[in-house]
Amino acid sequence: MAQRRASLGKITQPNVSAVLPRKRLFALLDAQRAAAWVTGPPGCGKTTLAASWLDHAGLRSLWYQLDEGDADVATFFYYLSVAAAARDDGAGEPLPLLTPEYQAGLAVFTRRYFERLFAQLKPPFAMVFDGYHEVPASSQLQEVLRIALEALSPGGRMLIVSRGDPPASLARLRAHQALTLLGWEELRLTREEAGSIVAKRQLGLGAEAVDALYARTQGWAAGLVLMLAQARVSGAIAEAPGLPTRQLIFDYFAGEIFHKADVRAQQFLLHTAYLPEMTTRIARELSGDPGTDELLASLTRNNYFVSLRETQPEPVYQYHPMLRDFLQARAGEALPKERRRDLQRLSAAQMEQAGRIEDAVALYRDCHDWDDMARLIEVHAAALVGQGRGETLARWVEELPAEVRTSRPWTLYWAAASQAQLTPRESRLLYEKAFELFRSAGDRVGTVLAASGAMFAILYELDDCSLLDRWIAVLDEAEKSGVPLPSPAVQARVACSMFISLTLRQPQRRDMKQWIERALVAAQSQADINLRMFVGSLAALTVMWTGLYARAAQLLEALRAMSTGPGVTPFSLITLKNIETMYAMFIADGAACARAMREGLEIAQATGVHTWTFQLLVWGYGGALGAGDLGAAAAIAKQLEPLTGQAGRFNLCIYRHFQAWDALLRKDLMEALQKEKAALRMAVEVGCPLYEALCRLGLAGILADCGDERRCISHLGTLRNIARGIDNRHLEFTCLTGFAQIALAHGRLRTGLAALRRALELGREYGYFHFLGWQPAAVARVLAHALEAGIEPDYAKSLIKRRNLVPEKPPLAVEGWPWAYRVQTLGGFRLLHHDEPLAAGGAKAKRRPLELLKLLIAYGGEQVSESRVTDALWPRIDGDSAHRSFTSTLHRLRKMLGEDRAVTLHEGRLSLDRRFFWLDTWAFEQLAADLESAAEPVQIEKLVERVLAVYRGSFMADEADATWMMQARERLRGRFARILARVYRHWQERGEEERARELYEKCLEIEPLAPPPGQFKPTVIDR
């Protein structure tokens, strides 16, 4: 409340009811376009014109007096929001504060801010920014006001009042006549206006005297008023002195008037000279004059360079800057140094009491009262940080002498807090200094807060996580000794800094869950919804990285519910979207991942909050890779590349790791090797064990594929040492699956299956279906091994179905592989969909689609031309009609199957997709090829058993003998006979006649038309 009360003078229009209305200038302003720049020398009536024009126009208005404090644009937006709130009817949401997360997108923030402000003001309205010359040219406010002018809505007017001309940044607006200029030539008094002012003073001056006054002042309002005041006290009009500047002329005449004023008035003016603004109470306290009310009213009424602003709960007065400069210079001449310092100190105390903190700090600084200045900074630092005014806070601390700064730990602490997000490295160093001072002073609470602050600074930078070790130890010690923290909000933040630090740096710690729950419980009691969302988001992130996805889902649901409440900032919303994107990536929900990423980026684009833009894109990239959508992944990578320069090593580590994953999916081993090496180097440099483990696993797999077994084993050994102590089931699942892939691919069956067994047990227990670096073909291969070995078959099948897995070489011979469609044609036709008959019922309607399916199988199931199909199925109709029949039948087949992708048509050729179909003909052909190349007796025996299990009889034995069917039947029968003849001969050559005869008898049971044993000769086999 003090801050709002303190701001009222700054945002209140001066009362100018007693001044001369300048109708000539009103007409100019009325005729001008939406924005006008009012410029002229001091004392020419700029502020008075702006205020009186507002009264004349009768518009809903907002007044803002700029000063040097507005160089920090966060201060500007803070007070502008206070001004808007004072005029709002309560229907609109409060305007946002420029907190650090907006700084990177200041232009977007500014545009959206003013769009909302203009909507709240409801056209027609007017805004006045007075005192633009007070703002340094280097301030970002220059750009802010340019954007505000460009965003000015129809029906809105804006006046900017300054002693100088518009800056170069506004040149385009001037060129397009969107900003007009009222300068000295327009502002100088006309002879008629000067005469009206003289007449109001009732000095009885004639026309010649007025002419003389006008000639001497050249239309300068301040000069005219001063000369009239001097004439009143001296009885004659003085000559204008030949001084080079208007300020010196002002000082000359003001000195004449001051010298002739009574002692009481002189004392009052000198005692109040240091006040930037005052109420009658404040002026009375400083001057000790009981007639303060009358004095100030008289100065205002006579326009003696004192303005009145009708603020609540009481009005405030301001000296014109020229008068204030004069009075302070006169005080320097008339008062002893110590008296001046006392007045400054007393003025500062009054400003502090009134809530004018900026003015109080400036006054304490000017009188070198460093202790009170530092005390005031420490008292109000938390509020300033919350308002986003870290630049102001840092500047104040910097203005303190070094010996004061380095002796006050809380001053250093707040200086660190003011810079944590924007310059985290400098912030960390300040926290370290504050920590040492707190420790020397025995301030245990201070040491905990400094340690927690240093942690957050390190986390904002994400460049060297090893720095966290020191502060983790500090918080551990504080926990053991029971350091009492001042509030639940502080408890939540401290616990939060601890568990996220443990996640990144010491994931082996078993107490991480306790720290998470402590933070969540402490945050729940807080009214600050953004604090609750901050803690909840980091908690969700941590449990996600530890593989507890069910718990992460619960936390995300709670966060989504909170996010719809009032007061939630864009930063909180984008943080939530970042966590949602990450979660969807982890659980391989590609659509949800892309949606959350897109929504987060849209909020960032709309608000200018780009804190998480890189991570949103990185998680979206990982989600696209996990979904196997390489096109979407490439598009996201293209967006990421321009951002890598500012990403930081941790984020770059993630990106390079994902680029290696991308390269593997594209089968570019060399690029994968290069990217994964870079990722591992950064993971080690950053000091994040979790990512070092993932990068070493990825690199080991790539090296194995490259044939570098020695380095592969070395990385696996280091990985084992890292992962062994980490209590993370998902990391264990990932590493064991990756190790199994490597081992099984290189013939280490026993160790590979042992690792696979443990991995699948974990996957089943915790419901895992994905990991970073997922390669569908490689995972499919190890799951084929699992099914062959009987390892967790139900879970393996569910994983295959959920992720649509098929190895590069389809596992046609693997029993239990959960094919979407199984088609038996050897010995009779049977179509199963997920092991249930599909073609039962509606046989007539399905006859033609099934015939098409049988034909495709007869022709090998792949790359069957449309013409070949139409020639076989519709031989008696013309081309167009045949094509229509083909198209219709294909549509009906896909509809019957319930999966359009199962039957593909590309460039006029039909294929059954091997990801969906198991055909006994395909399985037979593969087994036959394996058997023809087999040499070991045990291998031959196993393959024969499989062949006999698959080849159950002639192709489509129960179907009509169409030409295309008979051709396929004979081809397959011949292949069957040839491979069995080879095996028959193999057993004969080994002297195992009985086994050879048993084989022949089985062959006759299956295929009665097989040739007799006597014809199983090498020549026949060869032929």
Question: What spans do the regions from the language model cover?
Answer:
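C-terminal boundary/linker of central alpha/beta nucleotide-binding cores
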Residues: 37, 42, 50-54, 143-147, ...
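Tandem amphipathic alpha-helical repeat scaffolds
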Residues: 375-382, 410-424, 448-464, 490-508, ...
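Conserved phosphate-binding/catalytic loops and adjacent sensor/switch elements of nucleotide-binding enzymes
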Residues: 44, 49-125, 134-136
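Alpha-helical sensor/transducer elements of the RecA-like P-loop NTPase core
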Residues: 3-5, 24-25, 48-50, 126, ...
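Amphipathic alpha-helical segments of tetratricopeptide repeats
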Residues: 301, 361, 381-382, 398-402, ...
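Walker A/P-loop-proximal flanking segment of P-loop NTPase domains
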Residues: 1-42, 48, 52
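Intrinsically disordered, charged and Pro/Gly-enriched terminal/linker segments
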Residues: 154, 312-314, 324-344, 370-371, ...
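Short boundary/linker motifs that mark transitions into or out of structured domains
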Residues: 1-23, 788-846, 850, 900-911, ...
